[in-house]
């Protein structure tokens, strides 16, 4: 699997390099709502960016591991963590290499606007499912194809956008508790602002299920 293109890394480093947090410092609303209903444990956040969700979770008592390929994103996340008086384990790396894969390790995994090309998406989602501990939960929010044409953020190509049926297939080994599309109004910094169309998923790994993944 090829590593993330240098142009993508440069794009995200440029977006994160300023003092202002591009997506704000408050957690995603759906992530916060669902995480608050779970007992703290080990949490993995993929494509975590500037750390807003990681820092919130750490304040709630979670042991947080975050992964993103942007050094600038990590620097912003660490500054936010220090300001909020918490610690997060933030690793810089390419999600698509699956170096973060730890079968059965995490009590919760968050993918908040972790948009990937189809081949990479399927592999990353399968690895994320395998990294859940029995009884663990996976939380996802992403833009749907109906987001095209709206100025509130997201990829500009359909193949990078997610639909409930697609996610049901990707996470077929998990028990799906929620998987739906809806319209929302985003208030997440300057880069996620205004009316938007998103898909939300909450899934759990059954205690007796066997999910394996090898690189």
Residue ranges, per PLM feature:
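Conserved beta-strand signature within the Rossmann-like core of class I S-adenosyl-L-methionine
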Residues: 135-143
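A short acidic, Gly/Pro-enriched loop at the edge of an enzyme's catalytic core
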Residues: 100-108
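A short SAM/SAH-binding and catalytic strip from SAM-dependent methyltransferases
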Residues: 107-121
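Conserved class I S-adenosyl-L-methionine
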Residues: 1-38
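Conserved SAM-binding strand-loop segment of SAM-dependent methyltransferases
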Residues: 84-96
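Conserved SAM/SAH-binding beta-strand->alpha-helix loop
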Residues: 70-72
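Short alpha-helix
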Residues: 159-181
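A short glycine-rich, Lys/Arg-flanked "PGG" loop and its adjoining helix->strand segment in the class I
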Residues: 122-134
